[in-house]
C-alpha cells in the first residue's frame, strides 16, 4: 500500500498519467499470501498455492500426430435478437449434456430452439419457451419479425480432464459481496492436497485487500479489471474459474474475454443470465452512517437468508469464514456499483465453455428458477441441486461441493461417433 502511495506521488511530480497500469508488483507475506498491486495504490491479497514444481516431462505429441479426437466438441449455435425484445437461440449441433454426472438434476438433451423474452431493466423476468419460434398462442400465426442482429457461433473446442498432477491447470476462486477468500478454505485445502494449483483473491475492500474510500473503486468494471489483472498474472494453458454469487459475474466476464484460456467454469448460486443494474429502492441506498447502525441487523438477516440453519455451527462459519464482513461504505458502494448492461442473455448465450451450475435449494437470495434459466441459456451447462445447502453452500456442505467440483474437473465429453476409432481388422486365419 505504501509503495502504491509513493508511486502515485512520483506520478504527479513527473507528469505521468495517474491511472496508467504498469507491471504488477507483489509482496510475499510470511503466512503464504501474496499482495499484488494491480494499480497504483490498489492492492489485492491473493492466496496462491500449489504443489512443489516437478521435473518438466517431455512435451506430448500434438493432437494431429496422435490422431486423438477425445474431448473434441463442435459448438454450433445461431442467436437472433428481434426488435420486439425477444431472443431466439437455435442449437445447431450436438451438445454433450447427459454424460456428466450420475444423478444429475435436470439432465437431458437441450431443445433445438429456445425463445426467450429479454429481461427489461425494470426487473420483469423473461419467460423461456422451448420449441419453434413460429408457434403462437391460441393457434394464431405470428407476423414475420425482422431481426435486429444475428450471431453465428461455429467453432471446435477440446474439453479435457483437468487433473491435479497437470502443470498447465490453474483453479481461480472468486468470492461475492461481503465475503473474502476465506469462504473457499475447504475447497482450497482440498484441491491443493490433490495437487492442483489454486488462486483466490480478495476483492477490493474485502478481506485484507486495500479499501479505497471512493465509490467508483467498487463498480463492476473496476472490479472486473482487477480480476483481469490477477487472471493474466497467474493464468496458464487450461484455467478453471469458480465463482460464488456476485463473483460469478466476473467469471462470466473472463470467460467471454478469454475463450481460449478459460477451459471450464463453475457457478455457485450465481443467479440468472440477466444484465446487472442496481436497485433504486434498496436498503443499501441509505447513507453509510445509517447502514453502519443497521450492521447487526444486516448480519442477522444474512445468516437467516444465507444458511439453511441458524445454529451455533452456522454462526461460527459466518464469523470464521468472513462470509459477511465488510465496512458499510464498501457494502453500499458494491451494491450501487453493480451496473453491467452488457451481461445480458445474449452475452451468456455466446459462451462456448462448459459450465457447472451448483445451487443450494434453501437459498433465499437466488431462486432456483434463476439458475434453471441460466442452464437453458448456456450452450454447455449442467445444473446440480444440493437439497441441504443454501447460499453459502461451500461452507455448509464442503464435502458435497468438493466432490461435485472435482467430478466436473475430471469430466470430458465422450467422443462423437465420427471421432471413434475404427476397429482393427481381424487377423487372417492360418491355413492348415
UniProtKB/Swiss-Prot annotation:
Primary localisation category: cytoplasm
Segments for region (Disordered): 47-69, 121-149
GO CC entries: cytoplasm; mitochondrion
Basic residues: compositionally biased ranges: 139-149
Active site positions, chain numbering: 245 (charge relay system), 363 (charge relay system), 391 (charge relay system)
Entry keyword set: Cytoplasm, Hydrolase, Inflammatory response
Location in or out of the cell: Cytoplasm
Compositional bias ranges of the Pro residues kind: 52-61
InterPro entries named among the record's database cross-references: AB_hydrolase_1, AB_hydrolase_fold, Epox_hydrolase-like
Any GO molecular function: lysophosphatidic acid acyltransferase activity
Domain of life: Eukaryota
EC number: 3.-.-.-
One GO BP: lipid homeostasis
Family of the protein in this entry: Belongs to the AB hydrolase superfamily.
Quaternary assembly: Interacts with NLRP3 (via NACHT and LLR domains); this interaction is enhanced in the presence of NLRP3 inflammasome inducers, such as ATP, nigericin, silica, or alum. Interacts with ZDHHC12.
Protein name as it appears in the record: Protein ABHD8
Source organism of this protein record: Bos taurus
Amino acid at each position: 500500500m505504501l509503495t502504491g502511495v509513493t508511486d502515485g506521488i512520483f506520478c504527479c511530480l513527473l507528469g505521468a498519467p495517474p491511472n496508467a497500469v504498469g507491471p504488477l508488483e507483489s509482496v510475499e507475506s510470511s503466512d503464504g499470501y501474496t499482495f499484488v498491486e494491480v494499480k497504483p495504490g490498489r492492492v489485492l491479497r491473493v492466496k496462491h498455492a500449489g504443489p512443489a514444481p516437478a521435473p518438466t516431462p517431455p512435451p506430448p505429441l500434438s493432437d494431429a500426430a496422435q490422431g486423438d479426437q477425445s474431448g473434441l466438441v463442435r459448438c454450433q449455435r445461431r442467436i437472433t435478437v428481434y426488435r420486439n425484445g425477444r431472443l431466439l437461440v437455435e442449437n445447431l449441433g450436438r451438445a454433450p449434456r447427459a454424460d456428466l454426472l450420475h444423478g444429475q438434476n435436470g439432465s437431458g438433451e437441450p431443445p433445438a430452439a429456445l425463445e426467450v423474452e429479454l429481461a427489461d431493466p425494470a426487473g420483469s423476468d423473461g419467460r423461456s419457451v422451448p420449441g419453434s419460434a413460429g408457434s403462437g398462442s391460441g393457434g394464431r400465426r405470428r407476423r414475420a419479425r425482422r431481426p435486429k442482429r444475428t450471431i453465428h457461433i461455429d467453432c471446435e473446442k477440446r474439453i479435457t480432464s483437468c487433473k491435479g498432477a497437470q502443470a498447465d491447470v490453474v483453479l481461480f476462486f472468486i468470492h461475492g459481496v461481503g465475503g473474502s477468500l476465506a469462504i473457499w478454505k475447504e475447497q482450497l485445502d482440498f484441491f491443493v492436497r490433490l495437487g492442483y494449483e489454486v488462486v483466490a483473491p480478495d476483492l477490493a475492500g474485502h478481506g485484507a485487500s486495500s479499501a479505497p474510500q471512493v465509490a467508483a473503486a467498487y463498480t463492476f468494471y473496476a472490479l472486473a479489471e482487477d480480476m483481469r489483472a490477477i487472471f493474466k498474472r497467474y493464468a496458464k494453458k487450461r484455467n478453471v474459474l469458480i465463482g460464488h454469487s456476485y463473483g460469478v459475474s466476473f467469471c462470466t466476464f473472463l470467460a467471454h474475454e478469454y475463450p481460449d484460456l478459460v477451459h471450464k467454469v463453475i457457478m455457485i448460486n450465481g443467479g440468472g443470465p440477466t444484465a446487472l443494474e442496481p436497485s433504486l429502492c434498496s436498503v443499501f441506498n441509505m447513507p453509510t452512517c445509517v447502514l453502519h447502525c443497521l450492521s447487526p441487523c444486516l448480519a442477522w438477516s444474512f445468516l437467516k437468508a444465507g444458511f439453511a440453519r441458524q445454529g451455533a455451527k452456522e454462526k461460527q462459519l459466518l464469523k470464521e469464514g468472513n462470509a459477511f464482513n465488510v465496512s458499510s461504505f464498501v457494502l453500499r458502494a458494491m451494491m450501487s456499483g453493480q451496473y453491467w448492461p452488457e451481461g445480458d442473455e445474449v452475452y451468456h448465450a455466446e459462451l462456448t465453455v462448459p459450465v457447472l451450475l451448483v445451487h443450494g435449494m434453501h437459498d433465499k437470495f437466488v431462486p432456483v428458477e434463476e439458475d434453471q434459466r441460466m442452464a437453458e441459456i448456456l450452450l454447455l451447462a449442467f445444473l446440480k441441486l444440493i437439497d441441504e445447502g443454501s447460499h453459502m453452500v461451500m461452507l455448509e456442505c464442503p464435502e458435497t461441493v468438493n466432490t461435485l467440483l472435482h467430478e466436473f474437473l475430471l469430466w470430458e465429453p465422450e467422443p462423437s461417433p465420427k471421432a471413434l476409432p475404427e476397429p482393427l481388422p481381424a487377423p487372417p486365419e492360418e491355413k492348415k
